Every structure is written in structure tokens, then in C-alpha cells.
Amino acid sequence: MNSFDVVIVGAGPTGLACGIELKQRGRSALIIDKGCVVNSIYHYPTNLVFFTTPELLEIGGIPMTSLNEKPNRHEALKYYRRVADYFKLNIHQYEQVDSIEGSDLNFTVRSTDRDGVHHEYSARKVILATGYYDVPNRLNVPGEDLPKVLHYYKEPHPYYNQDVVVIGAKNSAALAALELYWTGARVTLVHRGEHISSKVKYWIKPNIENRLKAGEITGYFRSHITEISPNSVRLVTPEGEKVLTNDFVFALVGYRPDLEFLERTGISLDPATLRPQTDKHTLESARNGVYLAGVIVAGMHTNEIFIENGRFHGAQIAQDIAARLGS
């Protein structure tokens, strides 16, 4: 069995930052991810532009460059690959962590790779940095599991000349609706609220509002989907029930951390907020020796922690681990 000082679950920016900080303190670390490096960013829309500036996405003291004021998805992917190479981080991609057994200083992490081969690793400490983008919020309506219903939006081309419903009114939904419209889809936006979210990026919000006002994108507000069929959707609006011809549905109503994995790992969650119990100084959980990093610290309040502030969790955790493990 391969042994490490620390096994890190999750190879997003926060997980990479943890690996860097541990390596700089002379600690061995293995990073395991069920997807690719920065898997969540890879699954962002192809043309996404970050809301923040490059220096706020940096980890390990490595500068991030961008051709524009704000970096895009492609630039971020390239940057994090470069950082992983520079620090020679030990990363296992496409490997699912199944269980974390044992206790502080003597953990056994069991996993399965994409070929179905099982692995075991010994670790003195464990860090969970699993993010929140893997589990989409569900509509809980009949037909949601049809192949035409998608919870992630990548790019618009496949939906040219199709009838597409976009559910939601935050950044993901607004961007998807606009790109789909620009590419020739017939777009309908459905949202339970009164209007487009005030948190939508300033260069997107007026654009989507103008398309709605002009009728170029059809909008149903204070409305919700009640049923999805192969060729239509049924929704309830303030004017009553409507049935729309439909080819594809993008249910972009948010995401949440993999709470089931946390509970299975023995992490205590607050019943009201689903926040894991952690030490605010060290980010160690109530399960001794297991630390939490990144957005999962916030429970259901995923708008509290982003790459910009979660990237500092690595130093916070690594400092405590190094002090406890000693020389």
C-alpha cells in the first residue's frame, strides 16, 4: 500500500493549492479526482469569462496572464495545468474515492479508477476539497431524466434551429439563453422569480433583459415547469397552464456539494445550513485528521466561497498539518 502524509480528494484550484502548500512544507501528498484536473472549470461553458481578474485566481505564487482584463475558461485551464506541472504535483485523475477508513494518523483511502481497478492508500491526514459543481439541483418533475434535459451548458451549436427552454435566471442561465439565441435557437426562459437576478454579470444582464424586452427571447417569470415530455414541456404561469413545443431543456438552477459523500465520510453537517462542523482556524472537521477546503466549508451557502478566497485554505490547512506532524 502506498503511503502519504496527506491524501487530498479533489483536484480543483483549492485542492491544487493544498498540494502546493504541503509540498512547500516538505510533506508528501496525493491528489485524487474522479474527473480531470480542475474538472469543474473544464465543465464551465466553453466561452465563459470569469468575473474576477487574473491575480485573484492565482495559486502557489505563480502569475496568471490573460489577453484581456478578465481571464476566460481556456486561459484558466492552461494556467492550472501549468501550475500542476511546475510543482510536479502527484495527481491521480479519473479515480473515484469510495471510502476513508481508520482514524487520525492512520487513514486508509480506498478508490476505484476508470478501468475498475481498486486502490488503497495509507494517509496520516486527509483533506476533502470536492467542490460543489458535481451535483446539480433537481427540478423533481416528471420527465426530468429524459436525455433531452441537461444540467450543464457547454456551447450553443448543437441547438441551432431547435426549441430550447432554459430554466433559471442567474449567470449560467442568462449566458446560455443569450448564446443559444445568437446561434439560432428558439429560446424560452422560465424562472420562478420576478426578474433576472441582480447578481448576473454586468456585461450580461442588460443584454438578456433587452432580448426579453424585444421578444427575441420569450420569458416566463413567476412560472415553473411541472412536466417534461419528449416533444413538449408543461408549465404554470401567472396566466395559467401552458404547453410549449420543446426539443431541449437546460435546467440551470444551481448546484450543491456532494453532501452524501461528506456524510458517508463521517463529516457532521448542521441540519439547517448543511455546513460541516470545522475549526475556523485550522479547517479540521469534527472527524479528527480530516480537513475541509474550498466551497464545501460553506454547506448550502455556495455563494460565500469562491476560488478567490478558497485558494487560501491550502496554507491554512498545511500550516496546521505541518505543525502537528512535526519533523
Language-model segments: residues:
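A Rossmann-like FAD-binding core segment of flavoenzymes
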Residues: 88, 92-113, 120-123, 182-273
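Residues at the starts of beta-strands that form the adenosine-phosphate
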Residues: 5, 28, 163, 185-188, ...
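FAD-site-proximal beta/loop scaffold in flavoenzymes
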Residues: 144-158, 255-304
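Short hydrophobic core segments
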Residues: 7-9, 120-133, 165-167, 245-254
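Beta1-alpha1 glycine-rich phosphate/pyrophosphate-binding loop at the start
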Residues: 11-89, 174-203, 271-272
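A conserved FAD-binding loop/helix module that cradles the flavin
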Residues: 294-327
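Rossmann-like dinucleotide-binding core of oxidoreductases
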Residues: 126-149, 158-219, 319-327
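Beta1/beta-strand and adjacent pyrophosphate-binding region of the FAD-binding site
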Residues: 2-14, 162-170
